[in-house]
């Protein structure tokens, strides 16, 4: 008999024999594959459905080996009268370590959701939360977020949800449910640990929530694709597809830096934080700045060329929305190109540049954002062309 409150090694080996015997595909079993095993238990359909819901932790409609172990243990506990009924929640001892963070996050998200009909809407209004969330991460914020990440990441450059527990405790205006919600947004694959870019966006959400801005309901398609490491599916009509840097209305001097006390506790300091590595952007007495700016100019010129081609295609196919949006992006690219050309002129003439002008990270972010916009436009144009081709084909068939 299985020990109550523990999965024995022999038990796991037995479940593995059953699991592998069902011939999993991509290390998971579908409902059809598991169905014979479930029905052989002679448990009621209602109980089997509850067991499935508990075991399918990531809600993907399939069971991996860990989830299969949960299923089998619950079935055997019922058959052996170790438990009288299917538990309403998964027992803590039965939660796989790799999925513990997902269980907690799902609890945190489902809990406030169940209260929306009662008082959560009122509570949110009383809190006076704003919806003015800005995805753009300023260089100063990026430095702070990077410091937190570096202090807590493992040797593989990844950080777990629990590793930031001390940080969460310093956030007086961020409830636990919102922390879990932000974590789920940057971690669509429900990994136990996340990488640096995911962590920076996660901290950015917490920063805004601490300042009284609600956690967004979703992430832009370009970010989501990065987090999933998959080919992006952009929707240019979505308001979330825009990733433009915006200036906050509140003066920076009147805002306390995010996690300032936590950074000081780490021995880094909040507002005074600076990277200890070599800052090449401060090298003004060499040819480095000129070389860097020339490279940026080349990248921007290529982006402008891509935007012009997309605009020409849109005009040719008569898509007024795409044409206007392309023109807008083209203007933004040209303005940034003019700005970079002015930087290069100053560098050649020896004129001093401001710290912001020589910040390589900021320039790279701007170029990346513009590249995202151009890519979105190209994908959108392709879709519109497909729609046009389909309509023309339908019209042709009607004329016959």
From Swiss-Prot:
Keyword Cell division tagged: no
UniProt keyword terms in alphabetical order: Actin-binding, Calcium, Cell membrane, Coiled coil, Cytoplasm, Cytoskeleton, Endocytosis, Endosome, Membrane, Metal-binding, Repeat
Statement: the UniProt record of this protein carries the keyword Cytoplasm: yes
GO biological process terms held by the UniProt record: actin filament organization; endocytosis; endosomal transport
Pfam families per the UniProt record, alphabetical: EH, End3
Highest taxon above the source species: Eukaryota
Binding site for Ca(2+): 56, 58, 60, 62, 67
Domain EH span(s) in chain numbering: 11-101, 141-230
Membrane topology: Peripheral membrane protein
Residue ranges, annotated region (Disordered): 344-364
GO molecular-function terms, A-Z: actin binding; calcium ion binding
Cellular compartment(s): Cell membrane; Endosome membrane; Cytoplasm, Cytoskeleton, Actin patch
Coiled-coil stretches: 287-400
Signal peptide: none
Domain (EF-hand): residue spans on this chain: 43-78
Cellular component terms (Gene Ontology): actin cortical patch; cytoplasm; endosome membrane; plasma membrane
Function: Component of the PAN1 actin cytoskeleton-regulatory complex required for the internalization of endosomes during actin-coupled endocytosis. The complex links the site of endocytosis to the cell membrane-associated actin cytoskeleton. Mediates uptake of external molecules and vacuolar degradation of plasma membrane proteins. Plays a role in the proper organization of the cell membrane-associated actin cytoskeleton and promotes its destabilization.
Subunit structure: Component of the PAN1 actin cytoskeleton-regulatory complex.
Similarity section: Belongs to the END3 family.
Protein name: Actin cytoskeleton-regulatory complex protein END3
Organism taxonomic ancestry: Eukaryota, Fungi, Dikarya, Ascomycota, Saccharomycotina
């Amino acid at each position: 008999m299985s020990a109550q409150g523990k999965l024995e090694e022999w038990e796991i080996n037995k479940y593995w024999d059953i699991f592998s015997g069902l011939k999993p595909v991509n290390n998971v079993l579908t409902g059809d594959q598991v169905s014979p095993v479930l029905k052989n238990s002679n448990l009621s359909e209602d109980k089997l459905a509850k067991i499935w819901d508990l075991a399918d932790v990531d809600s993907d409609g399939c069971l991996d080996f860990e989830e299969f172990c949960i299923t089998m243990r619950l079935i055997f506990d019922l058959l052996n009268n170790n438990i009288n009924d299917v538990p309403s929640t998964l027992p803590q001892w039965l939660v796989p370590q790799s999925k513990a963070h997902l269980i907690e996050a799902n609890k945190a998200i489902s809990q406030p959701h169940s209260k929306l009909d009662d008082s959560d809407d009122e509570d949110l209004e009383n809190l006076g939360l704003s919806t003015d969330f800005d995805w753009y991460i300023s260089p100063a914020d990026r430095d702070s977020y990077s410091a937190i990440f570096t202090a807590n990441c493992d040797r593989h450059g990844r950080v777990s949800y629990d590793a930031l527990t001390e940080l969460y405790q310093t956030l007086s205006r961020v409830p636990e449910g919102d922390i879990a919600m932000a974590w789920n947004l940057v971690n669509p694959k429900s990994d136990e640990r996340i990488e640096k870019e995911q962590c920076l966006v996660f901290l950015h959400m917490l920063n805004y929530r601490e300042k009284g801005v609600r956690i967004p309901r979703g992430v832009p398609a370009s970010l989501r694709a990065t987090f999933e490491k998959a080919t992006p599916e952009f929707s240019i009509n979505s308001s979330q597809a825009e990733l433009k840097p915006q200036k906050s209305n509140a003066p920076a001097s009147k805002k306390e830096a995010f996690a300032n006390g936590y950074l000081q506790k780490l021995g880094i300091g909040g507002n005074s934080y600076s990277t200890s590595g070599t800052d090449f952007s401060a090298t003004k007495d060499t040819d480095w700045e000129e070389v860097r700016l020339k490279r940026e100019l080349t990248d921007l010129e290529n982006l402008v060329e891509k935007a012009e081609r997309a605009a020409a295609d849109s005009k040719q196919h008569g898509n007024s929305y795409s044409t206007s949006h392309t023109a807008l992006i083209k203007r933004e690219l040209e303005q940034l190109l003019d700005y970079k050309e002015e930087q290069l002129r100053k560098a050649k003439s020896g004129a001093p540049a401001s710290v912001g002008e020589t910040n390589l990270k900021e320039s790279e972010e701007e170029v990346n954002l513009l590249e995202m916009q151009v890519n979105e436009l190209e994908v959108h144009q392709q879709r519109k062309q497909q729609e046009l081709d389909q309509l023309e084909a339908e019209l042709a068939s009607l004329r016959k």
